[in-house]
C-alpha cells in the first residue's frame, strides 16, 4: 500500500523473492499420480500454439468475419486507451457520489450501519482503476495504453489524497466503531475492515491539527519523491571505470578478455595515468573477472567498484531514512520500525531482531561454516583454515563467484541443465499444478477462450477459470502470460473478491457486470501472472509451440519454482473469498502474505511432486529421480550462505529504521550516515563481510519494504513449520491440503495470522503472537 492512502491497498503487485530451500529428509515413496482427462487439454493449450488458436476460435464463437468483443479483463470500458481514461473518470464520479451519499446519511442509524460496507465499496471502486492502470503501465506493450495508464494513475491518486484529508469521513468511521449500539449489529468482518481503515487514517495523520497534518503530508510526499529517485538510480555506479595496475591487468589469464579491456582504453575520457589500466564496468567484463581471474587484488578492486553506488544515491537514501525517522516522531512512535510493525505479525522491532539473531545462529551451525569450509579448501588448495572464525574471515565477498565456479567445476556431472528442462514445458507444469490443486484443495483449472480485446496479447495470454469442484462454483480467473519481454515474474491483483452491495442499494448487478466478472452478486477475483521466460538466456526453442517446429517453451528448475511461487499467491487470491474487498485474498499482513507462495516452493523442490509432474516434452517419460537429484546438487551450493546474506539485509533494514535514527534528529535532520551503519552490520555479522563498498544504495527494498524486509525470511520459517506439520509425509495428501485451506488460505486478511497458524499446526501457544510465538517459529528451522 502506498504511504498516505488509507482507503486502499491498491497496486497489489507482489514481486518474486526466490528462495533456495530444498526439501530435506524426504522418503522416496510417492503417491500414485493419476492423470485426469483434462490433463492433455491443459498441456496443449499452453504448449501448442496451433491447438491454442483452434481452441480460442471455437470457444469464442468467432466466425470468418466477426467475433464477440469486450475490453481488457472483461471490462467493457477498456477497449482503447481513451476507454481507460473514461473508466477512471466514470469511477471518480461514482466515488464522489458515494462519499456524498455516505456523509449525508451518516447521522441516521441506517446510514451508520451501511457506512463501512460503503467505505469498502469506495475503496474497491478506486482500486479497480488504480490496479488495472498499474498493470497496464508495467506490462502493456502499447505506448498509448501506457500513457493513458499514467494519466489515470495521477488522476486517481490526486483524489485519494483528497480522501486522506477528509476529516468528516474519518470522524464518522471513528464514532461508528466507538458506538456499541451500532457495532453489535455489524459482522466481525465489517468491524475488522473498519478498524483497519481507521488505523490507516490515523497512521496517515488525519487526527492531527491542520498545521501538523500539512507538515505530515509534505513529509510523506517528500519521502515518496525520494523513493522514486532512489528506485530510478538503483543500478547506477559511482564510476563505470575501475583503475588497476598494469601488473594486475597482466594477471588476467584470458587473452581475449585482456584484449577487450585494452580496446576500451581509447574510450576512457578521464585523466590518464602511467602504469594504470581502466577496466570498464560494462557488459560481462567485470563478471568474467570475478568468476575467472585468480588475482585476489584484481577481483577486490573490481568487486568494490561494481558495488559502489553514486554519492547522490547514498545521500538520497540518507534523506528518506531521516524523513521516516521524523515522520515516526510526529506520530509518537519510538522509531519508523515501531510504526511499521505495530500491526504486523512480528509486532515489535525487538521480536524481529531476536528472530534474525536466532536464525543466523542456526544457519552458522547448520550450513554456513560447512559451505565456507569447502570454499576455503579450494582457496588454499586443500588446506583450509582451521577455526570457525578463521574460515568465516578468510572468505571475502570478491572470492565468492571465483571459488564457487571452481567448486562447480569440481562437482561437474554429466547431466546438463538442458536435460532437466526437457521434462518441464510450460503446459506440463500448469497441468501438473492442476493435478496438485485438485488433490489438495479440490480446485481445478479450466482453460477459457478469451474474447477479442480481453487480453493485452491474444497470441500469448491464456485465460484460466478456477473452479471449486465440490461446490461447482467459479472462484475466479487467471490471465497467464509466460512470454512477456517487459516484466520480471510478478503476481498482479486486478480485481478483488467481495460481495456486491446490492442488498443496501448502492450498486446493481446490471451495472457491475459490465466492469467485472460475477457469480450472481459476488465479484470474482482476477489475477494476472506475468513472467519473462521468452527472454531466458538458455532458451533454444521457438517462443510458442506451433512456431516452426511445434516444440514448447521449456523451463529451468528455477523457472518451475517461479511458477509454483506465483501460483501460491494466485490460490490465496482465489480461495481467500471475503464479503468485503479490503481483506480479501493476499490483502493480509505484509509479513504473512508470502507464506502461500513460499510454501509452494517446498512442493516444487520435493521429488515426490516434481518427478510426478515432470514429463518429457517428446516421449512423455517421467522425470527420473536420479536426474533431478544431480540437478539439485548444483542448486543448493551456498544455500545457507545465501539465506544468511538475506538475514544481513533484513538486519540492515532494521538498523536503518530503529530508534537511534530518531535520536539523531536532535543533532539535525541530515545526520544519518547509512554507509557507517551498513559497514557496522557487515563487520558484526562477518559472512562475506563488505566493509569497503556502498552496495546498500543498490538495495531497493530499503525503500519499498522499509523495516519489513524480514518478512520473507519469517514466512520461509513459517512455511517450513507448515510443511513439516502437514505435508512432509505426503505432499499429495488431500486431508492436509484441506486443513491448510480451511485454517490459512480461506481467511484472506480477516483473521489474525497467528490464529491461522495455531489452527494449522495445532499449537495454541502461537495464538498469542508474542516473542514466544516468534521463538517457536524460529526453532529447528530447515531454512
From Swiss-Prot:
Range annotated as the organelle transit peptide: 1-33
Gene3D superfamilies for this protein: Collagenase (Catalytic Domain), Neurolysin, domain 3
Entry cofactors: Zn(2+)
Cited function: Cleaves proteins, imported into the mitochondrion, to their mature size. While most mitochondrial precursor proteins are processed to the mature form in one step by mitochondrial processing peptidase (MPP), the sequential cleavage by MIP of an octapeptide after initial processing by MPP is a required step for a subgroup of nuclear-encoded precursor proteins destined for the matrix or the inner membrane.
Protein source organism: Candida albicans (strain SC5314 / ATCC MYA-2876) (Yeast)
Keywords annotated in UniProt: Hydrolase, Metal-binding, Metalloprotease, Mitochondrion, Protease, Transit peptide, Zinc
Keyword Zinc assigned: yes
Assigned EC number: 3.4.24.59
Subcellular location field: Mitochondrion matrix
Main location: mitochondrion
PROSITE patterns reported for this sequence: ZINC_PROTEASE
Catalytic residue list: 566
Family the entry assigns: Belongs to the peptidase M3 family.
Signal peptide: none
Highest taxon of source: Eukaryota
EC top class named in words: hydrolase
InterPro entries: M3A_MIP, MetalloPept_cat_dom_sf, Neurolysin/TOP_dom2, Pept_M3A_M3B, Pept_M3A_M3B_dom
GO biological process, one term: filamentous growth of a unicellular organism
PANTHER family per UniProt: MITOCHONDRIAL INTERMEDIATE PEPTIDASE, PROTEASE M3 THIMET OLIGOPEPTIDASE-RELATED
Cofactor: how bound: Binds 1 zinc ion.
Reactions mediated catalytically: Release of an N-terminal octapeptide as second stage of processing of some proteins imported into the mitochondrion
Protein name as annotated: Mitochondrial intermediate peptidase
Residues engaged in binding Zn(2+): 565, 569, 572
Gene encoding the protein: OCT1
Example of a GO MF term: metal ion binding
Keyword Cytoplasm: no
